[in-house]
């Protein structure tokens, strides 16, 4: 058996999220597994670093699967890209140790949220939009306070996997890039809809709809803190997944 790792990029707009679902619902995992099974002539089960929600995109999703096939790595990637819809692409095929797992071996995940200050017919598919002017320095000052270990339950949807609501954030901040306001955050793990919840809260404060003190109350998991409406899924990208050095990959072949 071989353990194969791939990097995946996708436009999440037409999909009901990453995770495979019954009843013919179209998901990114479902599309990838169907194409891989066809290429390798065996059933394939993918593990992924992040289970993105409906409409969320990825530039650096990482997956792995085990196979008995001896098909060369570049052939697998090329065949996948020929069969997959235009909204999904794979690259960086690597053979890794059998104990590597895309989700459980990851040390850090990074997300970026792209936000427009004016509506766009072209970029609206890949960015959120604010209906009011935003105080970017204030939003950045709030983002900086996320660094460290916090309970993010106030910013997320119900946790169903039993792993708790504490996350360790290495960095977070806002910046301007080519006409977009961009929120960048790196952490060991993320709760469901957590990044969109954080962005939604900071947008409300940056637009003057919420007092900045309410952000600290939410971060302190105050039972009386207001839960915010999450930002639109269209602006969120899983941008990178980081693994420890001891999961070095063999050369492509």
From Swiss-Prot:
The active site is at residue 53. Its EC number is 5.4.99.12. The keyword Isomerase applies. Gene3D superfamilies: Pseudouridine synthase I, catalytic domain, C-terminal subdomain, Pseudouridine synthase I, catalytic domain, N-terminal subdomain. One of its GO terms (molecular function) is tRNA pseudouridine(38-40) synthase activity. Substrate binds at residue 111. It catalyses: uridine(38/39/40) in tRNA = pseudouridine(38/39/40) in tRNA. HAMAP family: TruA (MF_00171). Belongs to the tRNA pseudouridine synthase TruA family. This is tRNA pseudouridine synthase A. It comes from Chlorobium luteolum (strain DSM 273 / BCRC 81028 / 2530) (Pelodictyon luteolum).
């Amino acid at each position: 058996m071989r353990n194969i790792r791939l990097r995946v990029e996708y436009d999440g707009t037409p999909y009901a999220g990453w995770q495979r679902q019954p009843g013919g619902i179209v998901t990114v995992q479902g599309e990838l597994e169907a194409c891989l099974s066809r290429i390798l002539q065996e059933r394939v089960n993918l593990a992924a670093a992040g289970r993105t929600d409906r409409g969320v995109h990825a530039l650096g999703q990482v997956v792995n699967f085990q196979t008995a096939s001896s098909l060369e790595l570049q052939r697998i990637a090329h065949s996948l890209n020929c069969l997959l819809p235009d909204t999904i692409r794979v690259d960086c095929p690597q053979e890794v140790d059998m104990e590597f797992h895309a989700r459980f071996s990851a040390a850090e995940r990074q997300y970026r949220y792209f936000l427009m200050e004016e509506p766009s017919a072209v970029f609206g598919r890949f960015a959120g939009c604010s209906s009011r002017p935003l105080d970017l320095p204030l939003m950045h000052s709030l983002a900086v306070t996320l660094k460290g270990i916090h309970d993010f339950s106030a910013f997320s949807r119900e946790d169903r996997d039993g792993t708790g609501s504490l996350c360790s954030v290495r960095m977070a901040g806002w910046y301007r890039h080519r006409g977009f306001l961009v929120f960048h955050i790196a952490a060991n793990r993320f709760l469901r809809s957590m990044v969109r919840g954080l962005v939604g809260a900071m947008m409300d404060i940056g637009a003057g709809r919420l007092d900045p003190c309410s952000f600290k109350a939410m971060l302190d998991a105050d039972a009386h803190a207001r839960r915010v409406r999450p930002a639109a899924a269209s602006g969120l990208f899983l941008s990178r997944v980081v693994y420890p050095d001891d999961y070095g990959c063999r050369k492509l072949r």
